[in-house]
Amino acid sequence: MAPIEPGASRTAGRRAGASTNKTKNYRVPVRARWLLVFAWALFIWSRSLFPGPESTAQSAVVVDILRPAFEALGVTNATLMSFLVRKAGHFLEYAVFGALLGSTPEDGRPGWRQVVPGLIVPSADETLQRFVPGRSGQLSDVALDCAGVAFGLFVTTGIRSVRRKYRR
């Protein structure tokens, strides 16, 4: 650090309002956050375009990986394992979607701009699946997907709330 001349201010030459904190506040612009939301929705929809047998084969790979954990928990029925993997997949991909939606409001509180896509995207996803060979759209999956969105929004909102509390 260069020596400061007598009578000179440490803040001389800094722009007004500039942070003196050495850690930078790296905020992702709102448009970029919405772009991530849109990209994740496209990812979800792309997964729904796989025909039934291919989707089942992908789930079987995950079941094989998780089989030791299932068996340790006493779950030995392969059909039940597949069902749990598929439903957990629904919930988790929509929890990520909800978390991304939760990152979009500037004030940290989700509003209609987050809730509406959180309802439309799962509904469109299940509708899309009705037109894919070997797939079906189910209302129970829409409900599970919406629960995942709500969970993601809840977690993101909670994290933002805690961060805001400790910033003060």
Label for each model-derived stretch:
Residues 3-5, 21-95:
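"…centered on the first transmembrane helix and the immediately adjacent amphipathic helix/loop
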Residues 15-20:
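Short, low-complexity intrinsically disordered segments enriched in A/P/G/S/L with frequent Arg
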Residues 29-32, 107-115, 138-139:
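Membrane-helix interface segments
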Residues 40-47, 118-126, 153:
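Alpha-helical transmembrane segments of multi-pass membrane proteins
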Residues 82, 86, 95, 99, ...:
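Active-site alpha-helix of zinc metalloproteases
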Residues 91-108, 147-161:
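Membrane-interfacial alpha-helical segments at the cytosolic side of multi-pass membrane proteins
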Residues 122-146:
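Interfacial helix-loop-helix junctions of multi-pass membrane proteins
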